[in-house]
């Protein structure tokens, strides 16, 4: 896949493109379905296939106080897109100038003049342009003026439910990891930097890597204990682990912390980038009467997680299929 970063007014020598456009947060199964339609149409038409996306969430420009809760970082999104076998990913720099373009002007200046799009396949509910005020019929009419065929793709349904990033976020907020992963088509994965913590886990025999909550723009699932797979950004192998998200009530914590215990691992991780893939929620976070009671529960959690990997998911270390 070619990744091409685009700014307004730049010119590029490009072959004719069959494209789709969107933010594609998480590149979930609905997105994958849409992209497969683009690839099929490109092959039939003898053109290149393309995804047009943005370098930041549009609401980060349109709303100054907007705090994104993303399913995927830009780097992860591009990696996921590359796995669809799309030819090109065009990453538009989203700023106030781009946001001000009407759908007509966007199609004329960006799709037609810059990207040489000849066929545009849009999602069943996708709208673009300033204030997203135009309709699919408007896009079709504009396309006729510019030599762009505009096609609406069907919705992708699973169990009679439309797959969307919003539904996935709601599942994650509720701790429904398996449901979210089914809609994504892969285990939900976050990335953040490892920072120093309180060392409470180490004292109980369960040393943890603490993630920098503020450095991560991705959505954190509901508070609780999770079965996870973990790897360092620059490594290959995945390790089993258990993660706690919450306020550490046994220690009277008041702020959110995210910490993960890596199974069968020793070493210094501080300052490194860690990827965590969520497999299943094990239990809610509880306040225990003593450190001994908490340590005993953590031992049981670890045993349950290992059984889950062995007997239910049949996942071994180093083979999990994630971004």
What are these regions (language model features)?
Residues 10-73:
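N-terminal catalytic cores of NTP/NDP-binding nucleotidyl/phosphoryl-transfer enzymes
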Residues 100-207, 289-293, 319:
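Classical nucleotidyltransferase
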Residues 197-323:
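Phosphate/ribose-recognition catalytic cores of enzymes acting on nucleotide-derived substrates
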Residues 2-9, 90:
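Short acidic-hydrophobic, aromatic-tinged amphipathic segments that line or gate anion-handling sites
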Residues 69-77, 101-107:
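Glycine-rich, highly charged phosphate/nucleotide-binding loops
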Residues 28, 81, 120, 180, ...:
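Residue-level signal for inorganic ion chemistry
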Residues 73-89:
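A glycine-rich helix N-cap at a beta->alpha junction
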